[in-house]
Amino acid sequence: MEYNKKLYEAIERVAVKNKTLKQELETITSDFKKIKEINIQLKKTTKIAEAFAKYKQKIDAGIVAEELLNTEKDLELVELAQMDLDDAKASIPVIENELKIMLLPTDPNDDKNVIVEMRPAAGGDESSIFVGNLFDTYRAYTESNNWKMKIIEMTPNAVGFSFISFMISGEEVYSRMKFESGVHRVQRVPATESKGRVHTSTITVAVLPEQDEVDVVINPSDLRIDTYRASGAGGQHVNRTESAVRITHIPTGVVAACQEGKSQIENRETAMKMLRAKLWEAAQEQQNAEFANLRKNQVGTGDRSEKIRTYNYPQNRVTDHRISLTLNKLDQIMMGELDEIIDALITDEQTNLMANLGI
């Protein structure tokens, strides 16, 4: 029976891990952070384990069928064995392809909620109007996926919107909405156009994964702790013992010191609290900088030439330029039917990943 033995071994390891995770989860009662981590791992490994069970069943059935064909004389049993073998040979390549996709590395942000920011770019009034149009599309798409939308900010202008931001929460939101990031181009005849000329305008869409709260983990080996005598007014040492504490976080150079406590232990505890707060603040600033840089990279300048997708109203046509996909159903897409486009983009991404990994 022919099958991908290397793939089989890799998937079998994941199935074993899935079983181990389930057993581990049963023993944890109060460590909610650990429970959350295990559940995230189980979410993916369970799908793979279930597919592996189906894969193994088809392989085993094929092996048994081959053995029967080589030994069985009863014509009826031979016919049944041949049917089982044909079914296994047809099913195994399909399941193997599904398993390969499941093994592909995933974006660590795929399970996160998203923050979406929409702005008019080139094209004047039509650009502002289309911000509102595409927002309605996203609202309909949110509802169709049983996600939840929360408006963060809406800034209307004379004809449409100069800015809209909102959050979408739900299952695997970023894994699908991330493909909406970029410049969207619209071609249509404005209501104010008396000569029927088609105008071209653009808007920018940034889709950002919701940021997790930054946890500060301090490695004791990264700390340098100095003690010294506490000073009073005028720099005079107010006691003979070195009760003041200065803690330096060596990797970042962040320093926290305390001398107000009555003992070295008290000052050390206070200095550690201060250090954690300072490191948290520094991490937040870095995270915000990365967040801003991600937004800049996604939306570009808003120039028409940077488009990811074109919406042509006169021809009822939508073209996604990243994969050269054209659909003549703009009216349906603007009502929130984005799945055909997004599914095609996901397939393209998976195909490229498999090609790069040589699988």
Swiss-Prot record:
One Gene Ontology term, aspect cellular component: cytoplasm
Primary location group: cytoplasm
Post-translational modification: Methylated by PrmC. Methylation increases the termination efficiency of RF1.
Keywords per UniProt: Cytoplasm, Methylation, Protein biosynthesis
Superkingdom to which the source organism belongs: Bacteria
Localization in the cell: Cytoplasm
Name of the protein described by the UniProt record: Peptide chain release factor 1
Function, in words: Peptide chain release factor 1 directs the termination of translation in response to the peptide chain termination codons UAG and UAA.
Species of the source: Ureaplasma urealyticum serovar 10 (strain ATCC 33699 / Western)
NCBIfam families found in the cross-reference section: prfA, PRK00591.1
Residues bearing the modification N5-methylglutamine: 236
Molecular function in Gene Ontology: translation release factor activity, codon specific
SMART domains noted in UniProt: PCRF
Family: Belongs to the prokaryotic/mitochondrial release factor family.
